[in-house]
Amino acid sequence: MTFSLIVATTLNNVIGKDNQMPWHLPADLAWFRQNTTGKPVIMGRKTFESIGRPLPKRTNIVLSRQLFEHEGVIWKDSFESAVNFVRDFDEIMLIGGGELFKQYLPKADKLYLTQIQTELDGDTFFPQLNWEEWEIEFDEYRKADEQNRYDCRFLILTRK
């Protein structure tokens, strides 16, 4: 099983502000959907609350120390029990938030990274990557357009 993280960050590693993403980029949402559909997605409670609903065509697992009940969502109280629950899948995706990324980035096999080519204010950050540990498997640059305010770089990184 491949353990992957998927995240969008600014150049200053911002991933959120006030429990929301401080940008709206349809290109990144499409990238996220393309790379997570059909796979189990693991997220923290705050990330689920910011999304507001289970993601369709995915097994939605919410990690929380406290019992969490919501239709279409599986609650687990530990990362290990979540992984054990979806152990038969080829790939599992950790989709946030900040604390889980910090804790589990060192264990990740793969990273789907959207680099938003700007710096923004935020209160939640992705850890600084050590690029020596990663090999670029995919790299696509997309210029800003009428729907996407910022240039984006879409990367798939695999651990060396």
UniProtKB/Swiss-Prot annotation:
InterPro entries: DHFR, DHFR-like_dom_sf, DHFR_CS, DHFR_dom. It comes from the Bacteria. PROSITE patterns: DHFR_1, DHFR_2. Changing residue 79 to L: In strain: Isolate R1042. The keyword Ubl conjugation does not apply. This is Dihydrofolate reductase. Key enzyme in folate metabolism. Catalyzes an essential reaction for de novo glycine and purine synthesis, and for DNA precursor synthesis. Changing residue 21 to I: In strain: Isolate R1047. Signal peptide: none annotated. One of its GO terms (biological process) is tetrahydrofolate biosynthetic process. NADP(+) binds at residues 8, 14-20, 46-47, 64-65, 96-103. It holds the Pfam family DHFR_1. Its EC number is 1.5.1.3. NCBIfam families: PRK10769.1 (NF008037). GO terms for cellular component: cytosol. Gene3D superfamilies: Dihydrofolate Reductase, subunit A (3.40.430.10). It catalyses: (6S)-5,6,7,8-tetrahydrofolate + NADP(+) = 7,8-dihydrofolate + NADPH + H(+). It comes from Haemophilus influenzae (strain ATCC 51907 / DSM 11121 / KW20 / Rd). Pathway: Cofactor biosynthesis; tetrahydrofolate biosynthesis; 5,6,7,8-tetrahydrofolate from 7,8-dihydrofolate: step 1/1. Substrate binds at residues 6, 28, 53, 58, 114. Coiled coil: none annotated. The gene is folA.
